[in-house]
């Protein structure tokens, strides 16, 4: 059986702490189409921010059971989603790159859908001037946190660059 990327992401958010710490700040609940997966993700996020550790499947099930805004049938479906999460090894670099691409694709898709609603006049809160900002924010989704210079860590490279002797060509 082939897993969807959403399932792979949820699985690794439950079992892979390094992955959780790297990607969790960039994933939004709206990126998940399936309500069951969205609910599971919300509980993973809540637990990680509250306890600063990985959640277990048992804790997830207990947390879901305590919710009052979902029906018993939805609880059963969410339990099914949770039970499908198994600890399967994945290459970390591939997983990070694929998750970043998925986040960017979902952000762009959702931004386009929101832009269409605004253009059709279905959104009373935003006008057409908001569309470029919405699309720009979606296009800028990236896991790269290396923005600018780190003056303490990059000093050797900068020193070499500043003091590099360039060969000059005479006219």
Show where each model-derived region lies.
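Noncatalytic partner-interaction/assembly domains of nucleic-acid and motor enzyme complexes
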Residues: 1-102
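Intrinsically disordered, low-complexity boundary segments flanking structured domains
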Residues: 65-68, 82-85, 136-143, 156-160
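Interdomain "pre-motor" coupling segment immediately N-terminal to P-loop NTPase/helicase cores
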Residues: 86-152
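Short, flexible helix-adjacent loops and helix caps
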Residues: 49-52, 120, 164
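The Walker A/P-loop phosphate-binding site
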Residues: 11, 142-171
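Short, surface-exposed, charged/polar-biased interaction segments
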Residues: 30, 44, 61, 81, ...
């Amino acid at each position: 059986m082939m897993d969807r990327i959403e399932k792979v992401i949820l699985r690794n958010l439950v079992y892979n702490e390094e992955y959780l710490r790297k990607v969790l700040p960039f994933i939004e609940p709206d990126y998940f189409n399936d309500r069951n997966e969205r609910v599971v993700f919300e509980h993973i996020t809540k637990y990680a921010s509250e306890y600063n550790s990985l959640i277990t499947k048992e804790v997830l099930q207990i947390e879901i059971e305590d919710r009052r805004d979902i029906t018993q049938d939805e609880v059963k479906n969410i339990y099914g989603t949770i039970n499908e999460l198994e600890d399967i090894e994945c290459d970390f670099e591939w997983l990070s790159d694929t998750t970043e691409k998925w986040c960017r694709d979902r952000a762009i898709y959702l931004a386009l859908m929101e832009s269409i609603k605004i253009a059709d006049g279905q959104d009373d809160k935003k006008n057409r001037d908001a569309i470029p900002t919405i699309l720009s924010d979606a296009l800028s989704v990236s896991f790269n946190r290396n923005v600018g210079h780190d003056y303490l860590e990059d000093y050797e490279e900068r020193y070499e660059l500043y003091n590099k002797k360039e060969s000059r060509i005479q006219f």
